[in-house]
Amino acid sequence: MGMSTAVASPVALDSGKLEPLRVMVVDDSVVIRGLISRWIEAEPDMMVAASLRTGRDAVSQVERADPDVVVLDIEMPELDGISALPQLLAKKRNLIVIMASTLTRRNAEISFKALSLGASDYIPKPESTREVAAADIFRHDLMQKIRHLAAKRRRPATVASPPPDHDDYGSNASTIMNAVDSNISERDAGGKPRRTFPHPALVQREQQPRSAQAARAMSRPQPTLRSFSAHLPRALLIGSSTGGPQALMTLVAGIGPVIDRCPVLITQHMPPTFTTILAEHLARAAGRPAHEGVDQEIVKQGHIYLAPGGRHMRVARKGADAVIVLDNGPAVNFCKPAVDPLFMSAIDVWQGGALAVILTGMGSDGMRGGTQIVAAGGSIIAQDEASSVVWGMPGAAVQAGICAAVLPLQQIAPKLVRLFAGDGL
């Protein structure tokens, strides 16, 4: 009932070379387990640390296998993924866990709970073994998530030092600390309820990466910032990807006065079903109506609109109103929904009154649309590197020189409240 392969021993490379990323694959399907393992072994910078059938196997082997990343199935015999997750995090400091699940509502809800308990990310898994074998997008996305989430962990072999200075990605610690605000209670190893507060092991996970992030941030040149628009903002646009659900929950919880003044439109890279659940979580966090955008519905202040999975969401002018326009066209920036279509469309509706926030995420989605918003007289705020899970999207905006502010996640909401009140310029 255990492993399909032996646990691989840690490798020692010549000093100065990077160790391969050690990935543990945990799935009760031998076919899927073998397929993902072959994909990992085909990557020059990765290796399979262990290939296991159940969550119980993973918990018992995690210290010996010493993985950097665990790809963890949700539905397994003996001990499922959500039950194994806190035990894995308690046993292995700095462990990155990517939850893998099929696109069912139940699994989407479990994935969100896993994020609140310390999982780094999730990935939707194709429904059948045949679909997995043919799923180039699934393979690409999984390898990218493993690589980008683990980037800050990589270091020269045999050197017990912080991540190298050339690591451009943000600390996963924000994922853990944002869980404190999620109001989802955790349980200890004995199953007893405890306060919603980070496990001591998770606090330790927070401390070291934060210091490395702070050192890198201090050594980096300060970004070139633009002045905020002289226009009073009339709409808030938000784009996010990896790490976005937790960041969005934190952000919307603090911008009630903004939502009351204007519409809030969000694109989060996420598949169908998951966006439905995310909208429900956002409504609870904000205490305001939030739902997936519906084609041709009128956009109103006091509401949060989320791009539905598998559709681009744009806005358009229709008489005196702004309306949602859903687009089933090709992926943009390899994503659907993508941030750029939303940002670009906002110019025709709000011109210089559009204010956009680019949160944590891989890639550069939002940068082109943000550039057009700035050219039209609007403003961009980017999440800073230290508080981002992955500083791809916000980093691209910063490097493009289009941002009026680059802020830690916890400082973005207060800044937005001041800006929309007219006193934050």
UniProtKB/Swiss-Prot annotation:
Q: Gene3D superfamilies from the entry?
A: 3.40.50.2300, Methylesterase CheB, C-terminal domain (3.40.50.180)
One matching Pfam family: CheB_methylest
Catalytic residues per the record?
A: 241, 269, 365
Q: Which residues carry this modification: 4-aspartylphosphate?
A: 73
Tell me which GO cellular component terms the UniProt record holds: cytoplasm
Q: Which NCBIfam families match?
A: PRK00742.1
Protein name as annotated = Protein-glutamate methylesterase/protein-glutamine glutaminase
In the UniProt record, what gene is named as encoding this protein?
Answer: cheB
